[in-house]
Curated annotation (Swiss-Prot):
This is UvrABC system protein C. It is found in: Cytoplasm. It comes from Christiangramia forsetii (strain DSM 17595 / CGMCC 1.15422 / KT0803). Residues 207-242 form the UVR domain. PROSITE patterns: GIY_YIG, UVR, UVRC.
Amino acid sequence: MEKPALEVQLKTLPNSPGVYQYFDKNGKILYVGKAKNLKKRVTSYFNKNHDSHRIGVMVKKICEIKHIVVASETDALLLENNLIKKHQPRFNVMLKDDKTYPWICIKNERFPRVFPTRRLIKDGSEYYGPFTSFKTVNTLLDLIKGLYKLRTCNYDLAEDKIRNGKYKVCLEYHLGNCLGPCEGFQPEEEYNNNIEAIRQIVKGNFKDSLQRFRNQMKQHSEKMEFEDAQRIKNKIDVLENYQAKSTVVNPRINNVDVFSVVSDEGYGYVNFLQLSHGAIIRSHTIEMKKKLDESDRELLELAIVEIRQRFSSNSTEIYVPFKVDVGEELKIVIPKLGDKKKIVELSQRNAKYFRQERFKQMKIVDPDRHVNRVMAQMKEDLRLGKEPRHIECFDNSNIQGTNPVAACVVFKNGKPSKKDYRKFNIKTVEGPDDFASMEEVVFRRYRRLLNEGEDLPELIIVDGGKGQLSSGVKALETLGLRGKIAIIGIAKRLEEIFYPEDSIPLYLDKKSETLKIIQQLRNEAHRFGITFHRNKRSKTALNTELESIQGIGEKTVVELLTHFRSLKRIKEASQKELADVVGSAKAAIICNFYHSE
């Protein structure tokens, strides 16, 4: 692959269903495709030799890849069709004809007909779907026809024409497939009740019909009519597996713009979905750099105006996740339920994916840019004199004062530097005293760094509130480092940030990158300290029992544990096995201790 930018786009594609679009150097769409897994499908074009010359030619022309994330593979198929018909890409052949996916139509007329169609006509008729194949449509229509007797003729069944006897029943009536509304044999109310039941079925509301089918199946089974019972069972299976509609296309939603936003400390990401005749025809996401810590609402209002101008949108209705003010001529809808809500959620998913991909691309193309941004943000958020490129965090660990230890973890440029981690046994403190323990380890840590001429951190974090912070400050003061290294404390309950000699804590935004890094430091220090403490307790328990044996010293204990790895194995070892490690005399002492009556 010749273009680094393209390689980055491939690496950051999501493992999700969706539609991808290939563009040439002039920004013209070359190809639109669907995928169950975008990353696998798109990457496959660039990872193998192609039997088709056409594909090879197309791949050489690709300069940019865009994609739209959807909820399912079916949605991807439908959206692919919409985009191909909209843009007519050069390399698309299979779906470039004038065919479209089928719908089920309930005609706007007296005694409505129910039939499949590829055309959506604005005459007040109801359309349900779309379906990915006529096989699915016909299966459902066969089911409906088996349940309800509907007319198939195209007569105008006006009341006066029926009353005047203009029509005669046809063969369908004599075959039992129609109840003869054309001659007035079926009341209009009864027919309309059947149509309402059909509406519920094609919309996916099957509860009543399923219950009726189950009752029928039970009755057939009780009468030993097993073939009829199986026929009803097949209908139940069809209903249960049928999905009435797609989150991508809905004919009742027409000429609408959909907007959503996600943001972090520095940037906002606004996604735009354009719907025409109930189908998504465009998805576009923009990145907006915050200047004055703008809210999501402010970002969305700015973006809506910009995007509508850019794409010359004439929609008079927009869907958004919350209230915005963008002009009186627009109808603002904040969906709470149903299809409209699902479309807004789809827009939000695309905005989130775009944001994730931007971060991944940034780290691949310019890793320093991301680090620099985070460091600058931490300096500003924490009111520091310089960027905290080197941060150290301390945590104490003990249980009722037993085996007191402490841990120091080190982050450099926002990432753990595990080779610099340090653990401490508390030496000068008796009993459970977190404050004195914190003072000891901070003092020992930086006395050593000073003595060895090592670099000092720009920021120290102590896990705890005002008391632990005061202890850390006292240690720095003793070393003459107070004011030379910034030090803060973080209290767990409310994630409060404490500063020396400041009784009012700082509360960072929960979405803040700064808070996330501080929490990561605190959690890592806690994990490292707990692991050390647990290991020390286990070792102490082993050593205490072995060293209590008269004639067995520390050196012998170490030899035994190194060889046998556990106290249980030492107890189970034979005298000969023990003698091979520590000699026959000590082996006899150990065996006598564990195996004497």
